[in-house]
Amino acid sequence: SLLQLRKMIKKMTNKEPILSYSKYGCNCGMAGRGKPVDATDXCCXXHDCCYGKVTSCSTKADSYSYSWEE
């Protein structure tokens, strides 16, 4: 879900995602497009691509089980 994504970004970067990344690079925020300018921008492009492939699902509202290692 978008809420889970926000929490993950906040935990890993200690930044508020909406304020820090809504207009970052070419792909972060609404209507992203173009060649990513760096690794963070590439992550936004990959995120948008994944959402684009599952448009028939409630991907933005559904909760998902996930984990990561620091």
UniProtKB/Swiss-Prot annotation:
Lipid metabolism is among the record's keywords:
yes
A single GO molecular-function term is: calcium-dependent phospholipase A2 activity
- What are the names of the required cofactors? Ca(2+)
- Its Enzyme Commission number? 3.1.1.4
Give the main localization category. secreted
How the cofactor is bound: the record states: Binds 1 Ca(2+) ion.
Tissue distribution: Expressed by the venom gland.
Superkingdom, according to UniProt?
Eukaryota
- The active site annotation covers 47
Q: Which UniProt keywords apply?
A: Calcium, Disulfide bond, Hydrolase, Lipid degradation, Lipid metabolism, Metal-binding, Myotoxin, Secreted, Toxin
Q: Which SUPFAM superfamilies match?
A: Phospholipase A2, PLA2
Listed GO CC annotations: extracellular region
Indicate which residues the UniProt annotation says bind Ca(2+). Answer: 48
Identify the Pfam families for this entry. Phospholip_A2_1 (PF00068)
Specify the enzyme's EC class, one word: hydrolase
Disulphide bonds annotated for this chain are 28-44
Described by its record, this protein's role is as follows: Snake venom phospholipase A2 (PLA2) that exhibits strong myotoxicity. PLA2 catalyzes the calcium-dependent hydrolysis of the 2-acyl groups in 3-sn-phosphoglycerides.
Name the protein family.
Answer: Belongs to the phospholipase A2 family. Group II subfamily. D49 sub-subfamily.
- Mention any additional remark: Hemolytic and neurotoxic activities are not detected.
Q: What is this protein called?
A: Basic phospholipase A2 2
